[in-house]
Amino acid sequence: MIDADRLITATGGRDRDEQMDRAIRPLSLADYIGQPTVREQMELFIQAARGRSEALDHTLIFGPPGLGKTTLANIIAQEMGVSIKSTSGPVLERPGDLAAILTNLEPNDVLFIDEIHRLSPIVEEVLYPAMEDFQLDIMIGEGPAARSIKLDLPPFTLVGATTRAGMLTNPLRDRFGIVQRLEFYNIADLSTIVSRSAGILGLVIEPQGAFEIARRARGTPRIANRLLRRVRDFAEVRGNGQITRQTADKALNLLDVDEHGFDHQDRRLLLTMIEKFDGGPVGVDSLAAAISEERHTIEDVLEPYLIQQGYIMRTPRGRVVTRHAYLHFGLNIPSRMGEIPVPDDFGDEPVDL
């Protein structure tokens, strides 16, 4: 199985990589690159909330892994001038776990819950009145003597992040006043991100070197920064330490990341669909078994970018590869492909929302 954040994933050094991720993470909306609509809207909402000395409305951020949901949550707290408490859905197993965090919040603080779609139903029930009325219902005692008491909470902002917005219950989703979807980044914005990260890390990088890394980063800043670190290793060991286009190209070829940003696992998925399932349609469970992966890995990690780039389509009967997949491997396009519709805009293809 592959890591959900993969490097395109190199093993080892994960702790150090995470420390570097924190070091290069933007701290303000002014430094936040890409997502112009989200940035403009959040700047407006934050300015309005600060002007009224109120907590920002509860905010839901969703999109594929690595696009900056956690970064945006931290920026919200920074711009609001408040503290942020971070946790995740799977960690909050009991209502008491959530209550302990909520009762320690200061007025207007931000509570960030990653993977919010994985909250247990019993914890979610406690969260509803906390979000809506800033009150916490707690049961005291047991059996016939049990009674419920209400504790007042300070106003706070819940920022929830998820890759699976479609798995949120309607009552929870409806309680978010602000909903933001993060899209895959274009190459120009990723090039800017790579150049900025290189500057923070003290690396010498040419614009074409940044472009080469950006165009293979699957539209994802997290992957772009990881590729930058691996290209840096290559440049220091087999070059003069400077990252040029040629250096980046050689390093990424060594990492088995092709010009489209596909790694071994992406190519394996596409070839399995072509060779074992005649291009599809194939169900996700059958596909997961064929490549020895978990269903959620295919749905959350592999598929979104392949769909957005137009290599895979979802149909009522299952997944189908498009002409682009055959052309990518230099294979002849089957005559029956003329019967398979190709979306006009793959960027609008819904991905588990």
Swiss-Prot record:
User: Which residue ranges are recorded for the region named Large ATPase domain (RuvB-L)?
Assistant: 4-185
Name one process (GO BP) from the record.
DNA repair
A GO CC annotation recorded here is: cytoplasm
Assigned keywords, A-Z: ATP-binding, Cytoplasm, DNA damage, DNA recombination, DNA repair, DNA-binding, Hydrolase, Nucleotide-binding
Q: Where's it mainly located?
A: cytoplasm
Xref: Pfam families = AAA_lid_4, RuvB_C, RuvB_N
> Where does this polypeptide localize?
Cytoplasm
Q: Where is this region: Small ATPAse domain (RuvB-S)?
A: 186-256
* InterPro entries given in the database record: AAA+_ATPase, AAA_lid_4, DNA_helicase_Holl-junc_RuvB, P-loop_NTPase, RuvB-like_N, RuvB_C, WH-like_DNA-bd_sf, WH_DNA-bd_sf
Which Enzyme Commission numbers does its entry carry?
3.6.4.-
Protein residues bound to Mg(2+)? T70
Record field: catalytic activity: ATP + H2O = ADP + phosphate + H(+)
Q: Which residues bind ATP?
A: I24, R25, G66, K69, T70, T71, E132, D133, F134, R175, Y185, R222
Query: Which positions does UniProt annotate for DNA binding?
Result: R295, R314, R319
State how it assembles.
Homohexamer. Forms an RuvA(8)-RuvB(12)-Holliday junction (HJ) complex. HJ DNA is sandwiched between 2 RuvA tetramers; dsDNA enters through RuvA and exits via RuvB. An RuvB hexamer assembles on each DNA strand where it exits the tetramer. Each RuvB hexamer is contacted by two RuvA subunits (via domain III) on 2 adjacent RuvB subunits; this complex drives branch migration. In the full resolvosome a probable DNA-RuvA(4)-RuvB(12)-RuvC(2) complex forms which resolves the HJ.
Note on domains (UniProt): Has 3 domains, the large (RuvB-L) and small ATPase (RuvB-S) domains and the C-terminal head (RuvB-H) domain. The head domain binds DNA, while the ATPase domains jointly bind ATP, ADP or are empty depending on the state of the subunit in the translocation cycle. During a single DNA translocation step the structure of each domain remains the same, but their relative positions change.
For this entry, the protein name equals Holliday junction branch migration complex subunit RuvB
